A protein has these predicted regions:
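Cleavable N-terminal export/targeting peptides
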Residues: 1-29
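Low-complexity, intrinsically disordered/propeptide-like segments
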Residues: 11-20, 66, 142, 176
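Mature extracytoplasmic/luminal segments of secretory-pathway proteins
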Residues: 13, 45-48
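Amphipathic alpha-helical interaction segments
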Residues: 19, 41-42, 167-168
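Gram-negative (and chloroplast) outer-membrane scaffold detector with strong preference
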Residues: 25-29, 33, 39-45, 60-161, ...
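Hydrophobic transmembrane alpha-helices
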Residues: 48-55
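Outer-membrane beta-barrel and related beta-rich outer-membrane complex signature
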Residues: 49, 90, 127, 166-169
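Solvent-exposed loop segments that connect transmembrane elements
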Residues: 52, 167-176
Length: 192
């Protein structure tokens, strides 16, 4: 896990450094439709009624976002965040689908803060499928590093939370009070 995190952080740093010249040539402009996607690594921590202490686990993450521009500092869109881990024949998947607002405090900067609300889900597959859906939210930050007129490399940090509630296996309740949260770091591409 530490090796993957180091590689990802190093790659993000190099991408930002390599894009410095391109960034100076391509100023920040936010207009119209935008879409982005990326991948990363994150730590998930679940809890539930009667489960005792569940450990945090590292896994791969991904995101997809798209939307429209409301102003030079405010974007509105939808975002899907997912975390997955496969180990010993068991695959766990956690995710959020959110309506999100992206706020750029300085018009000339690529730095942004985001927040959103929506749905959260959990799924575990190990022969039988355990799953549940509830409410969730996402918060995060990032930086659009312009590498072309309409393209940015976008390092991000995300936190997403879900209050899933009941987890069911074949229609029968297996766990109650399920909650989950994920912290992740990723690197994406955004098309403006």
């Amino acid at each position: 896990m530490r090796g993957v995190t180091r590689v990802l952080v190093s790659f993000m740093g190099l991408a930002c450094l390599a894009a410095t010249t391109a960034w100076a040539q391509h100023p920040q402009a936010r207009e119209g439709f935008w879409i982005g996607f990326g991948f990363g690594y994150g730590s998930a921590k679940p809890s539930c009624d009667g489960c005792g202490t569940l450990d945090s686990r590292g896994g791969f993450t991904g995101f997809l976002k798209l939307g429209g521009t409301l102003s030079k500092q405010l974007l509105l869109g939808g975002e899907v965040n997912a975390w997955t881990k496969a180990d010993s024949g068991v695959t766990d998947q956690l995710g959020n689908v959110s309506a999100a607002v992206y706020y750029y405090p300085a018009v000339s900067s690529g730095f942004f803060l985001k927040g959103g609300v929506g749905f959260s889900s959990f799924r575990e597959m190990d022969g039988a499928t355990a799953d549940g859906t509830g409410v969730g939210f996402v918060a995060g930050l990032g930086y659009d590093v312009r590498v072309g007129g309409n393209i940015s490399i976008t390092p991000v940090g995300n936190f997403y939370f879900g209050s899933v509630g009941d987890i069911k296996v074949s229609g029968a309740t297996n766990s109650t009070g399920w909650k989950q949260h994920v912290f992740d770091f990723g690197l994406g591409v955004t098309f403006h």
